[in-house]
Amino acid sequence: VLFRSAQVGKVWLVSYIGNFVGCLILSVIFVLAGASGTADYYAGFIGNKLSIPAGEMFFRAILCNFFVCLAVACGMKCKNEVAKFFMIILCIAGFVVAGFEHCVANMATFVTAALLVPGGISLTAALKSMVIVTIGNAIGGGVLLAWPLRMMSADK
């Protein structure tokens, strides 16, 4: 069990770092393409995003990754490609419209804001947000969805 936990931790760490590198590259391309909007928009947006109370941020993150993992589960269960597409879009749109927090989406948002508004983003506040949201995402996906699904299929 300890070995499996270490393997999961290693996969999560590599995935997290890989996602950050991908967000960094895409944010640079996004900014260089001029597709990122204005610096004024990002300055206000980031200020609001980083001022969300920690408890609220945590629960938004739990709900967010519940939706993300639900999208993955629906995608695996649907046999028809069109049905998969619409189920995934519906689940993802649910968390986006609700304004929930996802650590990978926040990585891209924070990097883009840092590139557009140099000095306009607090590294401490961004790191605090990332820790809270990452923990919430792990609970939302792992405890609220993956674990119950695993328990339901354990006898099979």
Per-segment meaning from a language model:
Residues 95-150, 154-155:
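C-terminal transmembrane helix-loop-helix hairpin of multi-pass membrane proteins
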Residues 32-57:
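Membrane-interface interhelical connector segments
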Residues 31-39, 77-81, 118, 149, ...:
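Transmembrane helix-loop junctions in multipass membrane proteins, especially transporters and channels
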Residues 22-30, 68, 105, 140-145:
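Alpha-helical transmembrane segments and their lipid-water interface positions
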Residues 79-94:
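Internal alpha-helical transmembrane segments of multi-pass membrane proteins
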Residues 1-2:
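Short, small-residue-biased leader/transition segments that mark boundaries at the very start
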Residues 10-18, 22, 132, 136:
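Alpha-helical transmembrane segments of multi-pass membrane proteins
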Residues 66-77:
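Alpha-helical transmembrane segments in multipass membrane proteins, preferentially the mid-helix core
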